[in-house]
Amino acid sequence: ILDNAISIPDEISIGVVSVPTGLNFSSQIKKVKTLNQHANMKFTFSNPDYSGLVDKFEWANSALIFAYDYKNKVNISNLTNTGYGQIARFAQQDFYLPLKKNIKKFEDLFNDLNIRNETFIDNPNHYDRSLFEKSGMGWQGKSTMMLTPGIGPWQLLGTIYVEINFQPTEERSFSCGECNLCQISCPTGALDNCLLYTSPS
């Protein structure tokens, strides 16, 4: 269905996970909220029972996980000019726009074929990291960021649940190993004391 119908740029990677997965992150999210370690953030924390639930739809048989690599889409001078404030790559423009544009191609195809689907992009009702590791696309680093070899953390995620059975991508094992430079370098210690639910020990 997809190979002959949709063209996507090299910056978009796609992984596939079979559902149901049995995964549920609700208790972790609620624990962080109870301990007041979420810095009063409402995103994801507003409805943990639903946002942390991976198997949201009984009709779904697959989840397509999209990652948009934006590391080469920025003005590097904004990061390297001395004497000026540095603007984070993520903040230089709305990188969700190309991600949404390409995911919509899949939505439109599924809808045209009357294939049931549901999309989550930057949505507080879905913990979008939950399927990233299982898809084999990368891992959750000690920096709390989702990392992919050759890309690093400069990517945005989206998910489509779909009723079709797609062949899942291979689940692979990644880790930071003994490296903890991000935790050592963090000036406030936030990587150890704040977003613990996103950072492996």
What are these regions (language model features)?
Residues I1-S175:
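Auxiliary alpha/beta "docking" domains used to position bulky ligands
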Residues Y197-S201:
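Conserved small/polar residues in nucleotide/adenosyl-binding loops
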Residues F174-G189:
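Local cysteine-cluster metal-coordination motifs and their immediate loop/turn environment
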